[in-house]
């Protein structure tokens, strides 16, 4: 590797990773609530460990959801269905400690997101952010999904690892797994090759390491990674510890919100610190991060920058963002100040405006809780639309 080249690494995890189990349970509960009550206020945290799951948090709703059933169904769907896997959806204990949302927070957000198909301008203006905070969105044109290459391939490999387990191709695989991909960038900051792939997968006790390594290369890596990105110098580490039988919540406790870099851009962009899963769309940690991605992706798709990072920031109880910042890392075709002006004029970034713009009061969140919230091609997510391209092009020419 020449001195002008650099390496960058990102990771992903499978849906059976303990932290991802927790994320999926939290979002499954959110979705069940939103199906029956689109205005439910939800902040649901989950902890999973050997033989049990516990859900805690604050939920305000007029409807009823059978939380233990949602938990068990989610764990079963992931694939923990037998005691010998270290976690069993039918025999695990499920505990719940749920409170109502604090009235102090509610009064900051409320003045009414009631049961209506349309939210009036007055209601949008009157709906404040549920907390202070800063959120980032990012996009780059180095992949068709407008995602950085390392996290793109990490997610693709992690998803493939799960697919070959579920479809029976590799019956000895178990749900827990991790992937890490290191990409080499040239002097023009373009991805040119994959330097290292690390895959660790939980497996049955009676399979050999040689068999695992051969099968993962054949059934997981080769179908996903183009041969043009691999060479004789590419390093493959498949189950480098030699054994991964004990996994999932039996191996490590899992918590909602501990995979925020996996959920976003793999460390390629900055992060405001707030997680997504288990939070209804009045929480700007989630909705504003989605809006920031929507803005950044449309800027790049419009050809106004090769890469773009958008920061939004909010004050609790205040509708308008306190700041909008855009960084194009020297790739912008127009001044960043002009992009900020165009964004202010063409995107409603008030909390209720984001909810309306992206139609977020729907049960769409569980599908985001594994394999990334951004750049997905397997599910239709509203913040991945590129429907503001023409508007932005016109705005920066004005």
Curated annotation (Swiss-Prot):
Record's keyword terms, sorted: ATP-binding, Cytoplasm, Magnesium, Metal-binding, Nucleotide-binding, One-carbon metabolism, Potassium, Transferase
Family: Belongs to the AdoMet synthase family.
GO molecular function: ATP binding; magnesium ion binding; methionine adenosyltransferase activity
Binding site for K(+): 45
Compartment(s) of residence: Cytoplasm
Subunit and partners: Homotetramer; dimer of dimers.
Positions of L-methionine binding: 58, 101, 252, 283
Protein's organism: Staphylococcus carnosus (strain TM300)
Stretch forming the signal peptide: none
Pathway linked to the protein: Amino-acid biosynthesis; S-adenosyl-L-methionine biosynthesis; S-adenosyl-L-methionine from L-methionine: step 1/1
Region Flexible loop, annotated ranges: 101-111
Free-text cofactor note: Binds 2 divalent ions per subunit. Binds 1 potassium ion per subunit.
Main location: cytoplasm
Residues bound to Mg(2+): 19
Matches recorded under Gene3D superfamilies: 3.30.300.10
Cofactor field: Mg(2+); K(+)
InterPro entries listed in its UniProt record: ADOMET_SYNTHASE_CS, S-AdoMet_synt_C, S-AdoMet_synt_central, S-AdoMet_synt_N, S-AdoMet_synthetase, S-AdoMet_synthetase_sfam
Entry function: Catalyzes the formation of S-adenosylmethionine (AdoMet) from methionine and ATP. The overall synthetic reaction is composed of two sequential steps, AdoMet formation and the subsequent tripolyphosphate hydrolysis which occurs prior to release of AdoMet from the enzyme.
Name recorded for this polypeptide: S-adenosylmethionine synthase
GO cellular component, one term: cytoplasm
Catalyzed chemical reaction(s): L-methionine + ATP + H2O = S-adenosyl-L-methionine + phosphate + diphosphate
Residues binding ATP, per UniProt: 17, 176-178, 243-244, 252, 258-259, 279
Alphabetical GO biological process terms: one-carbon metabolic process; S-adenosylmethionine biosynthetic process
Enzyme Commission number, as recorded: 2.5.1.6
């Amino acid at each position: 590797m020449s001195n002008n080249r650099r390496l960058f690494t990102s990771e992903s995890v499978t849906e059976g990773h303990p932290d991802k189990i927790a994320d999926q349970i939290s979002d499954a509960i959110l979705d069940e609530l939103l199906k029956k009550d689109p205005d439910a206020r939800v902040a649901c945290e989950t902890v999973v460990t050997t033989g049990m799951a516990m859900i805690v948090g604050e939920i305000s709703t007029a409807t009823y959801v059978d939380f233990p059933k949602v938990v068990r169904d989610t764990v079963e769907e992931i694939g923990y269905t037998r005691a010998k896997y270290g976690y069993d959806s039918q025999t695990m204990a499920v505990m719940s400690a749920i409170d109502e949302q604090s009235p102090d927070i509610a009064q900051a957000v409320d003045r009414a997101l009631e049961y209506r198909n349309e939210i009036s301008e007055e209601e949008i203006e009157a709906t404040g952010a549920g907390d202070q905070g800063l959120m980032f969105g990012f996009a780059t044109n180095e992949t068709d999904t407008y995602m950085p290459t390392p996290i793109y391939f990490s997610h693709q490999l992690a998803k493939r690892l799960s697919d070959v387990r579920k479809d029976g191709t590799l019956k000895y695989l178990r749900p827990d797994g991790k992937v890490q991909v290191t990409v080499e960038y040239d002097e023009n900051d373009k991805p040119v090759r994959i330097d290292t792939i690390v895959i660790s997968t939980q497996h049955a006790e009676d399979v050999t390491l040689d068999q695992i390594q051969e099968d993962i290369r054949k059934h997981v890596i080769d179908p996903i990674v183009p041969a043009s990105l691999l060479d004789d110098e590419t390093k493959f580490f498949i189950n480098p510890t030699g054994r991964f039988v004990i996994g999932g919540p039996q191996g490590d406790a899992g918590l909602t919100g501990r995979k925020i870099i996996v959920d976003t851009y793999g460390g390629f962009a900055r992060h405001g610190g707030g997680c997504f899963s288990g939070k209804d769309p009045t929480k700007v940690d989630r909705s504003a991060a989605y809006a920031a991605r929507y803005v950044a992706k449309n800027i790049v798709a419009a050809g106004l920058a090769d890469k773009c990072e958008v920061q939004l920031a909010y004050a609790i109880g205040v509708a308008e963002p306190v700041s909008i910042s855009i960084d194009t890392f020297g790739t912008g075709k127009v001044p960043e100040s002009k992009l900020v002006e165009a964004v202010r004029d063409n995107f409603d970034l008030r909390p209720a405006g984001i909810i309306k713009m992206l139609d977020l009061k729907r049960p769409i969140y569980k599908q985001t809780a594994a394999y990334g919230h951004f750049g997905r091609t397997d599910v239709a997510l509203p913040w991945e639309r590129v429907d503001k391209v023409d508007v932005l092009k016109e705005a920066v020419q004005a």
